[in-house]
Amino acid sequence: MTVEGETPKRCPECNSEHLIRDYEHGELICADCGAVIEDAYIDQGPEWRAFDSDQDERRARTGSPMTYLSHDKGLATEISWSNKDYYGKRIPHKNRAQIYRVRKWHQRIRVSNAAERNLSLALQLLNDIGAKLGIPKDIKETAALIYRKAVEKNLIRGRSIESIVCASIYAACRKVNIPRTLDEISKASEVNKKKIGKAYRHLAKELDLNLKPTTPFSYISQFCNKLDLDKQAIVISEDIVRQAMSMGISSGKGPTGIAAAAIYIASVKVGKPRTQKEIARISGVTEVTIRNRYKEISKALNISISE
């Protein structure tokens, strides 16, 4: 039950915790099933309207909010690359070479040493990987904060920037209970999965992250959504996982494999069968793993389906 005025923590339709606040439309949306949970959220943005970026800049009375995604936290002045002045007029060609030199030196001053240069590159990489994964800005901000803490404690030494960035994203996703698999992050970043896992364990230990272990429930909505399976399949999958966990079948086994096997069974039960190959592709586990988990679950729960 949700107390009046309190923000819901789970989607009432699919029970997912992956909720996104759309401030522009005043809505709280489930990222997994698309349900609009709230539609009357008060817009805390400016009272004025702007119809293009130039008008937006002219009407704004404050700068951009502080962000961990910029090496200077967004507090420094930036010179626009649009070749327009404050009033939106184009800068004459005769002055553009001078503006280019000013802009170039300004960039050099903003990133004045190797440490700042490395941080700037790392945060740009974090932004790029985050965009490929489709994760919201608040998770990227959390990942950037984790990365900054790693830099402060000198945890980057002896490891690649890429692996620590990926590990920070993985940790941030787990922290807000919207886990992404190591396979997903590896594909988006082209960094070896084992290196990411090793870097993550290093960060978790040294930064004392204390993240709870992921469970099969964390992946079911996400996987079902990718497989175009409805709420009924999600409910059945979760019920199968619940029974499997109560019988100790999931002990010592990867949560993604258990979730994938449960979804395989559920998809057949709801009349929308998905092949083990399809499920393996979106879950990042092998067909052999799905087959083994399926056999263990079906035997323990006495489930019989026509494959």
Swiss-Prot record:
One of its GO terms (biological process) is transcription preinitiation complex assembly. InterPro entries: Cyclin-like_dom (IPR013763), Cyclin-like_sf (IPR036915), TFIIB (IPR000812), TFIIB_arc (IPR023484), TFIIB_CS (IPR023486), TFIIB_cyclin (IPR013150), Znf_TFIIB (IPR013137). Stabilizes TBP binding to an archaeal box-A promoter. Also responsible for recruiting RNA polymerase II to the pre-initiation complex (DNA-TBP-TFIIB). The lineage of its organism: Archaea, Methanobacteriati, Thermoplasmatota, Thermoplasmata, Thermoplasmatales. Gene3D superfamilies: 1.10.472.170, Cyclin-like. Belongs to the TFIIB family. This is Transcription initiation factor IIB 2. SUPFAM superfamilies: Cyclin-like, Zinc beta-ribbon.
